[in-house]
Every structure is written in structure tokens, then in C-alpha cells.
Amino acid sequence: MNIVILAAGMGKRMQSALPKVLHPLAGKPLLSHVIDTARQLSPSTLCIIYGHGGEQVPQLLQSKDLSFAKQEPQLGTGHAVMQAVPQLNDDSPTLILYGDVPLTTAASLQRLLDIAGADKLGILTVDLDNPTGYGRIVRENGAITRIVEQKDANEQERSIREVNTGIIVAPTKQLKTWLANLSNKNAQGEYYLTDIVASAVADGVQVVSAQPDHVWETHGVNSKVQLAELERVHQNNIARALLEHGVTLADPARIDVRGTLTCGRDVSIDVGCIFEGDVTLADGVRIDAYCVLHNTTVGAQTHIRPYSHFEGATVGTACIIGPYARLRPGAVLGEDVHIGNFVEVKNSDIAAHSKANHLTYIGDSTIGSRVNIGAGTITCNYDGVNKSRTIIEDDVFVGSATQLIAPIRVGKGSTIGAGTTLTKDAPADKLTVSRSRQITVDGWQRPVKIKK
């Protein structure tokens, strides 16, 4: 099967220099949603028609299974499909999709393909209470005879509620002939793809139709308002699927999934959370309000407190994280690790039962089990040129306001006194401290402010 995706439109109402089909919905371009759906149908040819925005579309979406054809100037949908003709295989049908209609499901498209087979012209249609702006499906004795655009329709035709979604499948050899015979003698001066319906009828090719499971599958995006509306539709669909899977959502209207969210049993998600990329939450995970998780895996029974931000992290079981914690790429936490408020962890492994509860930076470090990191501790991993690692072995106690100048190793069971700046390895099972001796100055008085 051939699939052609029309993605050349300017999108003037978007009020943006970015091509319309590259605007994001749920974290990825509109066009990428359509491509992902098309791939589920296993096409032999997948051709993207681009135009507005120059080379941005092919540059962003390069892939071995995609081909591209440029439409310049843009003279209508029929003219757009003409640009793909050299790439279409005559021996299989051609399905035409739209880069700004992102939510059509593969199931609805497969239904259309099954009805059309290899020798019929198939049209995906919907019935609308208000069909204004859509091409009307004109039938005679139940059979589709043509599609008339809104601007070319008479009063009787405008009363028709069944409309064309634009999604069409056609036998390719005949499609090429019909495209070659298109005329632009209409109110828009464009070559309408819909005119092939009349050509098919004239050639004795049966025209059939199918309808999607949901009307929103055919909604397109022509403005930021429509984009926002479709974003809510999509997020509501995701929220419903999560609820049906057993996830507890404090408010289904206040969750955003911009990628893939996989949840185990008894997962609870509070309001305002955002999930980006691939996120996996194991059984019993609890996420409090306004957390952001990007490409992160969270182990069972872990509790993430409010306003925490994870990116590229792996969190073990029964951990307590936050509030206001930040896990950056390469953060790997073992079982029962506690990361508290205003603690940042980057490119570090922290083993089971260790804690850093307050105001700490842990970067490029390996931390053993049962380690306590005091408030205000900083691993000084960067010398202005190179980054070095800090190694803290099991059962270490690091006092508050400590700086560890990497590369450095803290031996097993050692204690680092509060306020220490550690520049050499600390031996195991001993107290290491480096700070000036405390003194008291008798008779000292504070300076007095000088009057000006």
C-alpha cells in the first residue's frame, strides 16, 4: 500500500513562522502523530508532501522509510497528490492522509481500507450537526456521486450533514489518471482532490465510505485555538485510558502526557503533573502535585513529593523524593533512598538506604549504602575544564556544609565533620575534619554606623 501525507499548507491562522504540521501536540509535531499512525498500516511507500517552511519538514523528520516531495506553489489538495505520483506503486492502493489531522486511529483507517479493497474508491466521512466549511457528500439512491466544496455548493447541497474528512483511498493506476484530468475551474482556482469522485463514478468505479469511531479523529488544526482544543481531547483520551487501567488521577483534566506513560497497579497521580518521553511507574507509586518526569523509571512503592523534576533518572523501590528535588540524567537510586528538598543529583549512583535530605548537590558520584549526606553538602566535580568523580563508600556520615573536592574517595564507615572542605581521601572508620579552630574575642564590639 502507498500512503501519501499532505503537509504543505501554510497555516496562516497559526500566526507562526513554524510550518503548521510541526507545531507540537502532546510533545511531538502534528505530522509525527500522522506518520506514527501510518506506520501501523505497514505501507510499502510513505511519502510526505511538504511546501511551506522549505526544508524544515524533511530535515526534522528524516527516516529511511519516508520519502518527500515538494509542492511549490500550493495549488490545492489534488495538486499536492500529483507531486507524489512518481513514487506510487500501481499494484497497490493509495491512502491519502493529512499532516494537520493527528488523531485518526489506525483502526478507523483499516476499516476504510477493508471496505475499499483494491478496486474501489473509499472516503472517510462523518455526520456533523454543523457541517459549515466542509465538503458535502452528494448521494443519489444511496450511492456517492460526488463531493461539493462549501464555496461551490448550492443551498440544497449545503443542507447535507454528511461531510468529507479528506481521507481517501483509491486504486493507484486510476488515481493517476484522475489526477491528470483535474481542472481548477472553481471558486478557489485550485485542483480539488475531491473531484476524483466524479471521475470515478464516470469510469464505473464504485465509491464507498466508512466512518471513524469518533468524530474527533477527523478534526484538523488551523489555529492555535484548534490546537489547544485538540490537545485537551487527546489528553482526556489518555487520562480515560489510565483510569480504566486502574490509575488514580486526582483530576483527569489536569495531567499532561507528552510521550508514553506506563503504569503498574495502584499508581496515584496528583494534579498538574507532566510526563514527557518514556516514563514507567511501577506498582504503588505515588506522585504528588506539579511534578515533571522525563524519560524516567520509578520503582514500586516510591513516593515523589510535590514540585520535583526528574530527567533521565532511574529510581528504585520504596524511595522518598522531594519536595522540590531534581534528578538529572544519569541519576540512579537504589532501594529506600531519600532525596529531600532542594537536593540535586546528576550522573550519580546512590545505593540502598542512603539519604540526602536537605540543600545538597551530588554530581558525578558513586555513593554506597546507608550513607547520610548532611545539609548543604556539595560534591565539587568540575575544575573549570574537567569533571571528576566522588566515591563515598558504605556507612559514611557526611556532616553539614561539607565540600568534597573531586576526584576523591571517602572510606567505609568514616565520618566527615561539619564544615569540612575535603581535598584528600578520607580513611575508613575515622573522623576527618578540616576547619579552623573556634576562638572567642573578649571585649569585641560591633562597628558603629558613621553618620554622613
UniProtKB/Swiss-Prot annotation:
Q: What is this protein called?
A: Bifunctional protein GlmU
* Regions that span the bilayer: none
Question: Which function does this protein serve?
Answer: Catalyzes the last two sequential reactions in the de novo biosynthetic pathway for UDP-N-acetylglucosamine (UDP-GlcNAc). The C-terminal domain catalyzes the transfer of acetyl group from acetyl coenzyme A to glucosamine-1-phosphate (GlcN-1-P) to produce N-acetylglucosamine-1-phosphate (GlcNAc-1-P), which is converted into UDP-GlcNAc by the transfer of uridine 5-monophosphate (from uridine 5-triphosphate), a reaction catalyzed by the N-terminal domain.
Give GO cellular component annotations, separated by semicolons. Answer: cytoplasm; membrane
Q: Which family does it belong to?
A: In the N-terminal section; belongs to the N-acetylglucosamine-1-phosphate uridyltransferase family. In the C-terminal section; belongs to the transferase hexapeptide repeat family.
Q: Locate the region Pyrophosphorylase.
A: 1-224
Q: What is the organism field in this record? A: Herminiimonas arsenicoxydans
Q: How is the cofactor bound?
A: Binds 1 Mg(2+) ion per subunit.
> Residues annotated as region N-acetyltransferase?
246-452
Molecular function GO labels: glucosamine-1-phosphate N-acetyltransferase activity; magnesium ion binding; UDP-N-acetylglucosamine diphosphorylase activity
Q: Which GO terms are recorded in the biological process aspect for this UniProt protein?
A: cell morphogenesis; cell wall organization; lipid A biosynthetic process; peptidoglycan biosynthetic process; regulation of cell shape; UDP-N-acetylglucosamine biosynthetic process
Q: Give the residues annotated as active site.
A: 358 (proton acceptor)
* Subcellular location, record wording: Cytoplasm
CDD domains listed in its UniProt record: GT2_GlmU_N_bac, LbH_GlmU_C
Q: What is its EC number?
A: 2.7.7.23, 2.3.1.157
Identify the cofactor(s): Mg(2+)
Q: Where in the sequence is the signal peptide annotated?
A: none
| Chain coiled-coil ranges | none
Q: What keywords sit in the KW lines?
A: Acyltransferase, Cell shape, Cell wall biogenesis/degradation, Cytoplasm, Magnesium, Metal-binding, Multifunctional enzyme, Nucleotidyltransferase, Peptidoglycan synthesis, Repeat, Transferase
NCBIfam families with a match to the protein in the record:
glmU (TIGR01173)
